[in-house]
Amino acid sequence: MHRARRLHSLCDVLRGVAHASLLFAVAHVPGGPRAYHAVTRGLLRSQHRVIRKLRRVWPGYARVWRERCGLELDGRTIWVHEPGWVPFAPLASYLLSGRGGVLTSAAGPPSDRYVAASVRAILESELAAEGAADPVRHARIAALVDADAAAVLSATSTAIATKVDPSSLPLDTGSVDLCHSGGTLEHYRPEVLAAFLRESFRILRPGAVASHVYDHRDHLRHVDGRWPFLLHMALPDDVYRVLFGHGLMFHNRLAPAEVMALFDAVGFERIAARRFVLPDKRYVDGGAAEAGEAGVPRWVGSGRLARLSVEDRHTAAIHYLYRKPERS
């Protein structure tokens, strides 16, 4: 039985290697990354899956901000960093706060293509069903179903900065009550991540909240669900740099303790580190080793895996919640 289990794991690895080889080739062909994104966003409709996911997870975020962080959202300025190509974030922020939010992105603005789907998703979500917005906000969003992305930003009074450098952001000091990102920080090299956290500390008001969902999983897990989700941590740094250092696959591979240390170094106060476990796909405040499956087989212990605690080896992602101290 033990041998069969190892053979099954080896087959998963070989499948993942095949996917990684394809992405490596695409990343190094001129125009390859652009063509790859065109295929995934167009033919494979990946952004519609993103919209469905955002519709599912944002109500939970809103509850956490209110209940765990003690942040009343009405009238607050919500900043979403790297919202992606769908205009879900400005609609959700407006529904929750009733005032214009802020978007920052290293790429361009949201696409017109996904406006109607985003509007419908917001109106059908728990955010609207729970009465999070008054009728005026609800009606204003409903009227945008046939609009373009620019009209969405205008109607919700959302400010946007594109082509930004995350280490030097064009936002005013002390101007935001909540900064949120999802699936972004793990793509930053450690020095860039540290600089972004310093910038966000500057931009947040005293008492404001930093909310970042950091996916600790190997990116190949998104390509093949059978891939051991922490296997990238087993690779030597030099090998990882050569094989996965390109834009389609790079992950900074920081351990949870290393991520927390970066928040601490800036001056943030920790509220919670909610661990996301599989296969149940739920957050736990503790006991991840008992609640979730392991990200690699127990017998694998090479590379950066030595930096992980038992809890870390059973953690797929973490929702890091921090506060800027009132006196800062």
Regions from the language model: what does each represent?
Residues 241-256:
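Acceptor-substrate binding/catalytic loop of class I
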Residues 181-184:
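A short beta-strand submotif of the Rossmann-like class I SAM-dependent methyltransferase core
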Residues 166-179:
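A short acidic, Gly/Pro-enriched loop at the edge of an enzyme's catalytic core
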Residues 73-85, 209-236:
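Conserved class I S-adenosyl-L-methionine
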